[in-house]
């Protein structure tokens, strides 16, 4: 079974600010979870549902393990992103 994908959701990032630091500098992307439980595998991104609006700096910090309590931090960003995505009709 393949992971769930949504071009509408992933492309919505270009219209959003970073949910972690608030940056609205053109570097915000839909940053996918790095958790296997969210569908992440070798060379496979997690389901699009498990992502967050993150700028380049915050995305890099997450990917490189530079945030404390990595899963808890990501889930906090995910929750904020899901509220935005639902309110704006991206989901």
What are these regions (language model features)?
Residues 31, 53-56:
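A generic structural signal for well-ordered alpha-helical surface patches
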Residues 39-49, 60-91:
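Polybasic, low-complexity binding patches
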Residues 23, 57-60:
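Short Cys/His-rich local motifs and their 1-3 flanking residues in nucleic-acid-associated proteins
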Residues 2-11, 39-46:
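Short, intrinsically disordered, charge-biased short linear motifs at domain edges
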Residues 26-42:
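Short recognition patches in nucleic-acid-associated and regulatory proteins
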Residues 4-31:
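Short cysteine-rich loop/turn motifs with clustered Cys
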Residues 17, 51-54:
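The −1 position to Zn-ligating cysteines in a subset of zinc-ribbon hairpins
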